[in-house]
A protein has these predicted regions:
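Conserved glycine-rich cofactor-binding loop
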Residues: 8-11
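N-terminal Rossmann-fold NAD(P) dinucleotide-binding loop
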Residues: 14-15
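Conserved glycine-rich Rossmann-like NAD(P)H-binding loop of the short-chain dehydrogenase/reductase
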Residues: 24-40
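Rossmann-fold cofactor-recognition segment
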Residues: 45-60
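Conserved Rossmann-fold cofactor-binding substructure of NAD(P)-dependent oxidoreductases
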Residues: 56-74
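Catalytic loop of short-chain dehydrogenase/reductase
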Residues: 83-89, 98, 120-172, 179-191
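Ankyrin-repeat alpha-helix packing hotspot
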Residues: 105-106
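C-terminal helical subdomain
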Residues: 177, 193-244, 248, 252
C-alpha cells in the first residue's frame, strides 16, 4: 500500500480521489485550506494518515504545508490537485502575486521543491492548457489587462510543463499531468458534461497502481489515455525558462 498526499482534498476531485485510495487501503494525507474546510472531510479523517492545513495563496502557508507533510514522513506519491478557476480579478497575495498564479503555479512548484521527493508525482492540468501563452514575460499579470480564462490556461500550461520537466530531470520519479475533463464539481459547475469518476480515477491510477501502463513518466493523460500536450509544455527551452522564473518569484530552487 502507498502513502499518498493529496492537495485540495476537502471537496471535488481531490476528496473523491482521497476516499477511493483510503477505501483501497492506502495511507492518505489530506489537505484543506483552513480548519473550516477540513470539516468537509471529517468523515474521512479517522481513516486518513493525517490532515495538513494551509492556504496556497500564501507563500508562508504553502511552505508550512510542506513542513507538515515532511513531519509525517516520506510520501510514495503526491497528487497536486488543488487549484482555483476563473478568478474575477487578478487579486494580490501577501507577496504581491496574482492569486491564480500563486495557487495554481507557484504552490505546486514550491511543494515539489520542498516536500521530500516521492516515487510518483501527479499534477492536475486541464485541456485549457492548450490556450496558455508560451511567453513567461508577464506570467504574474502586472502589465496585461486581467483575463481570467487566459490566466487559468497559462497556470495549467505551467504545471503541465513542470510535470514533464521532472519526468526528464528526475529519472527516479514517475511524473505525469492529468486532464480530468470538464467534470461536475464545485469548480466545474453542474452543467459539466464529463465523467466525474473517470476524472479522479486517472489520478489515483497514476499515483498508486502497479499496472505497467500506470508506471510510466512524462505523460499527459485524459481518462487513462495518453494525449498530446501543448508544444510548449514539452519544449525543454520553455521548461527551463519557466522553472527559472518560478524560482525567481518564490526564492526557492528546484533541485535536479
Amino acid at each position: 500500500m502507498s502513502r499518498v498526499f493529496i492537495t485540495g482534498s476537502a471537496d471535488g476531485l481531490g476528496r473523491a480521489a482521497a476516499k477511493l485510495l483510503i477505501d483501497e487501503g492506502h495511507d492518505v494525507v489530506l489537505h484543506a485550506r483552513n480548519r473550516e474546510r477540513a470539516a468537509a472531510v471529517a468523515d474521512l479523517v479517522p481513516r486518513a494518515a493525517g490532515v495538513v492545513i494551509g492556504d496556497f495563496s500564501s507563500a508562508t502557508e504553502t511552505m508550512g504545508v510542506a513542513d507538515q507533510v515532511n513531519e509525517l514522513g516520506r510520501m510514495d506519491a503526491v497528487i497536486h490537485n488543488a487549484g482555483i478557476f476563473l478568478e474575477p480579478s487578478r487579486g494580490s497575495t501577501a507577496e504581491g502575486h496574482a492569486t491564480t498564479l500563486a495557487v495554481n503555479s507557484l504552490a505546486p512548484y514550491m511543494l515539489t521543491a520542498l516536500i521530500e521527493r516521492p516515487d510518483r508525482l501527479v499534477y492536475l492540468s486541464s485541456g485549457m492548457h492548450h490556450g496558455g501563452s508560451g511567453s513567461i514575460r508577464d506570467i504574474d499579470w502586472t502589465q496585461r489587462r486581467w483575463n481570467a480564462s487566459k490566466a487559468y490556461s497559462e497556470s495549467k500550461l505551467h504545471v503541465t510543463a513542470l510535470a514533464l520537466t521532472l519526468a526528464r530531470e528526475w529519472p527516479g520519479v514517475l511524473s505525469n499531468a492529468v486532464d480530468p475533463g470538464w467534470v461536475p464539481t464545485k469548480m466545474g459547475g453542474p452543467a459539466a458534461s464529463d465523467d466525474l469518476e473517470l476524472g479522479y480515477l486517472t489520478q489515483t491510477w497514476l499515483a498508486a497502481s502497479s499496472e505497467a501502463a500506470a508506471t510510466v513518466s512524462g505523460g499527459y493523460w485524459y481518462h487513462r489515455q495518453r494525449q498530446q500536450p501543448a508544444r510548449e509544455a514539452a519544449d525543454p527551452a520553455f521548461q527551463r525558462k519557466l522553472i527559472d522564473r518560478l524560482a525567481g518569484l518564490t526564492g526557492i530552487t528546484l533541485r535536479t
